[in-house]
From Swiss-Prot:
Organism this protein belongs to: Yersinia enterocolitica
Endpoints of the signal sequence: none
Key words, A-Z: ATP-binding, DNA damage, DNA repair, DNA-binding, Nucleotide-binding
Function: This protein is involved in the repair of mismatches in DNA. It is possible that it carries out the mismatch recognition step. This protein has a weak ATPase activity.
Family indicated by similarity: Belongs to the DNA mismatch repair MutS family.
GO biological process: DNA repair
UniProt superkingdom: Bacteria
Gene that encodes the chain: mutS
Name the UniProt record assigns to this protein: DNA mismatch repair protein MutS
GO molecular function, a single term: ATP binding
Amino acid sequence: TLLNEEVSPAVEALESLDPDSLSPRQALEWIYRLKNMV
């Protein structure tokens, strides 16, 4: 079941992300950070 699976670090990062508060540069940095996690 889903409850027994570990949550991906990328998913955890996305859950804490507030896209409306990011500058375009910060958003780009997040994309690269998330890409490196998967």
